[in-house]
């Protein structure tokens, strides 16, 4: 079972998304900020991170930078309400595999998740 970590400060979104992902066969968990993300990732590697950009403390860009610095190899999909072109380009340059704007369509998100996770299997 593939594991997904949701990193977002919106507790309601995290709870709903975790439930939706678990229902379709993923092992999903969530944390509410960048600091918690590194505590989690240090102890339990995951296949994919769904990452918000705007959070208190360490934001999504900080998380992307730190993933690279600490050489934590995991796929990242940015999932954010701040869907401007510059953020998408900057995220890609920092290693994000894809970029989805909120509000998201779960079916489209699921297609993107499957696409990103399958890249290693090609």
What is each stretch, according to the model?
Residues 11-29:
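Two-component/phosphorelay signaling modules centered on CheY-like receiver
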Residues 104-114:
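C-terminal output helix
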